[in-house]
Regions:
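Carbohydrate transferase catalytic cores enriched for Leloir-type hexosyltransferases
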Residues: 1-204
Length: 204
């Protein structure tokens, strides 16, 4: 198969969570799959953290803005490559795509009522873009991947998609994540308890 993967922002220096998921997935595919041919579409950036290999081709697409990159440059590139499918990795995708579409939908926070409006101009535009694009592309997707059974349930309840369209595939974890030795002298300075749960994440 010829498989196209959108990984637009993985070359930017300050990567976000979705960028790392896409990057590590592609790295693992490079190690594991030497039969299918992959075309990775990326926006140019300073951190060239991925190189082409035998069956994995890095294709840089230049475009001034994210929406134009995704809605104009990406579909044109896909049309010229003629892959068997396009996998978009970060919640959004082209509204018009000439090949079957697979989408990774990490969450639907942007479709819910906002608790705060203290966003930068860039974040504000991204929020509106996702609200506009996501509901329109979901019916066109052959398959939608989300990151947990919990998120799958939330998406099904909120958007009433066919159950067979949406699958949960849990993220892997990098080998640099491991259990740290206990350091009670440090933790007791901040948490006066033997057992505790320290959580970092969104508020949804």
């Amino acid at each position: 198969m010829k498989i196209a993967i959108e990984a637009q922002r993985i070359f930017r220096p300050n990567k976000h969570g979705m960028d790392f998921v896409a990057l590590e997935t592609i790295r693992e595919l490079q190690k594991m799959d030497h039969e299918n041919e992959y075309f990775i579409f990326i926006s140019p950036g300073e951190d060239r953290c991925l190189e082409s290999s035998g069956n994995v081709h890095i294709i840089e697409l230049k475009c001034p803005t994210y929406p134009l990159w995704e809605q104009v440059a990406l579909p044109q590139a896909v049309k010229s490559i003629k892959p068997d499918l396009l996998h978009c990795t970060s919640n959004t995708a082209p509204l018009h795509c000439s090949v079957p579409l697979v989408l990774t939908l990490h969450d639907i926070i942007y479709l819910e009522k906002r608790q705060s409006s203290s966003l930068s101009w860039y974040q504000e535009m991204g929020w509106h873009y996702r609200r506009l694009v996501v509901p329109r592309i979901l019916p066109k997707c052959k398959k939608i991947i989300t990151v947990s059974l919990f998120e799958r349930k939330r998406i099904l309840e909120a958007l009433h998609l066919p159950e067979e369209q949406l699958v949960a595939v849990y993220n892997g974890f990098n080998s640099h994540f491991h259990l740290q030795p206990k350091a009670p002298k440090i933790t007791r300075k901040y948490i006066d308890a033997e057992n505790y749960l320290f959580f970092l994440g969104n508020t949804d």
